Curated annotation (Swiss-Prot):
This is Chaperone Ric-8B. The gene is Ric8b. The modification Phosphoserine is found at S468. Its main location: cytoplasm. The keyword Chaperone applies. GO terms for cellular component: cell cortex; cytoplasm; cytosol; plasma membrane. InterPro entries: ARM-like, ARM-type_fold, Chaperone_Ric-8_A/B, Gua_nucleotide_exch_fac_Ric8. Belongs to the synembryn family.
Length: 520
């Protein structure tokens, strides 16, 4: 009945009446996502009628409800045949200011029309393979990049940027050819990185360092949404970027990683939005070549170093809250390097563990990122080892019992999801510099057996990667408990597969123990 009435008024052709009836339809069906199949033909005819109205050049006040209704109807894949013609797609491109490269964005009154047109295109392209093919033929990705360049520094048109970026994300998600076009032909990597810089209002203090105002206001909802869409589009553009072949590529990835470091250190308007923002930043960091992730940490300036040394001494004894803040800040500094971003990643990982669900989608990206960072960058590994595997003092409880980050990760080593338990074990193994004896010390033999069996290390030894050597960090508690722990060591094996006699196994272990040290 709603479609019949709307179609009758739309065909009558009076702009004021069309505006009223379509606004009523839009208000009533704003949250409708499932449609009656009996009215399918009426909805198709209503779409055709709306395009005829849009061609006439009706006022903006009438164009907006027309596009709102078209957006609602385009949620139904079955009625998109009359919508996905080249003529109708061109109408939407014109209304979205995508039809001309030199068209300006000066008329504020047109902004709602541009936004609604982009929303329609998002739905239509996502739901129709015909529209996807037309998007390639009409070079829609290039037109979207041109629109972004017009508005990348204009904060008052965040909605336009947001839906432009969303449409870019949809296109690059559905077509690998568009990913390649965005990356190389359209210079999508620097363009989208600049969009992020604008959303975060970044002020650079060095080539790869930005000023962080911890006391500043959170991002606005519009800035946060815009940043999230840019992060998602960048993920698609860089999804195959495992190796850097040119110096210019390396520089651009480092700039992007520095922007993502800034992203991790700011907050959105709500806790949920902050988590969504950081989650997309983590996903994108996973695409950055690991050699470029060194910019996640940066040296303290002379002023910061002096302030770090003086803060605790200057605070009087009764200033407990201030001292707690200073201690927290000090915990994010390691070996003269600012580790705030790594600390945020570690906290993010722990929150995802505490959720207790969707580990594969929510936890494995950040665990993989921290593992690769630790393997490639010594300072990051040493900082994470200090946070996750501090000197072992609790030798009375099993490694998986407790509420520390170590306990939580050890519990994951026996998780039912193979991918989750593998990456949790790999992370701890890398923090132990791939030394079997060190891993057993922190996790226990039973928890580590799966990883060691997969790597052929059940008899001991270490992994293939090289790590620097440092001093022994065994605590007195661990040294006292060690004789008991040695009783649980597995027996040795002879080349023919028979068990080594106990005396020979113990003497071999003593030699190994004398020539090795448990390090950082």
């Amino acid at each position: 009945m709603d479609e019949e009435r709307a179609l009758y008024i739309v065909r009558a052709g009076e702009a004021g009446a069309i505006e009223r009836v379509l606004r009523d339809y839009s208000d009533k069906h704003r949250a409708t996502f499932k449609f009656e199949s009996a009215d399918e033909d009426k909805r198709k005819k209503l779409c055709e009628g709306i395009f005829k109205v849009l061609v006439k050049g009706v006022p903006t006040t009438c164009q907006v409800p027309c596009l709102e209704v078209l957006r609602i109807l385009s949620r139904d894949k079955k009625i998109l045949a009359p919508v996905t013609t080249e003529e109708n797609m061109q109408i939407l491109l014109r209304l979205a200011k995508l039809h001309e490269s030199d068209d300006s964005l000066e008329k504020v009154s047109e902004f709602p029309v541009i936004v609604e047109s982009l929303k329609c295109l998002c739905n239509i392209v996502f739901n129709s393979q015909v529209a996807q093919q037309l998007s390639l033929e009409l070079n829609l990705a290039a037109k979207l990049c041109n629109l972004l360049r017009k508005c990348k520094d204009r904060k008052f048109i965040n909605d336009i940027k947001c839906f432009d970026l969303r449409l870019l994300f949809v296109l690059s998600l559905l077509h690998t050819d568009i990913r390649s076009q965005l990356r190389y032909e359209l210079q999508g990597l620097p363009l989208l990185t600049q969009i992020l810089e604008s959303a975060f209002s970044i002020k650079w203090t060095d080539e790869y360092e930005s000023a962080i105002d911890h006391s500043g206001p959170p991002l606005s909802p519009q800035e946060t949404d815009c940043a999230i869409e840019a992060l998602k589009a960048l993920f698609n553009v860089t999804v195959d970027s495992w190796k850097v072949h040119k110096e210019s590529d390396s520089h651009q990835f480092r700039v992007m990683a520095a922007v993502l470091r800034h992203c991790l250190l700011i907050v959105g308007p709500t806790e949920d939005k902050t988590e969504e923002l950081h989650s997309n930043a983590v996903n994108l960091l996973s695409n950055v070549p690991v050699s470029c992730l060194d910019v996640l940490i940066c040296p303290l300036t002379h002023e910061e170093t002096a302030q770090e040394a003086a803060t605790l001494d200057e605070l009087p004894g009764d200033k407990t809250a201030e001292k707690d803040t200073a201690l927290k800040s000090s915990a994010m500094v390691y070996n003269g390097m600012n580790m705030e971003a790594i600390h945020v990643l570690l906290s993010f990982m722990e929150k995802r563990i505490d959720k207790g669900s969707s580990y594969r989608e929510g936890l494995t990206p950040v665990l993989s990122l921290l593992t690769e960072c630790s393997r490639a960058h010594r300072n990051i590994r040493k900082f994470l080892k200090d946070q996750v595997l501090p000197p072992l003092r609790d030798v009375t409880n099993r490694p998986e019992v407790g509420s520390t980050v170590r306990n939580k990760l050890v519990r994951l080593m026996t998780h039912v999801d193979l991918g989750v338990k593998q990456i949790a074990a790999e992370f701890l193994f890398v923090l132990c510099k791939e030394r079997v004896d060190s891993l057993l010390k922190y996790t226990g033999y039973g928890n580590a057996a799966g990883l060691l069996a997969a790597r052929g290390l059940l008899a001991g030894g270490r992994g293939d990667n090289w790590y620097s050597e440092d001093e022994d960090t065994d605590t007195e508690e661990y040294k006292n408990a060690k004789p008991k722990e040695e009783l649980l060591k597995p027996m040795g094996l002879k080349p023919d597969g028979t068990i080594t006699p106990l005396e020979e196994a113990l003497s071999q272990y003593s030699v190994i123990e004398e020539t090795s040290s448990d390090t950082d």
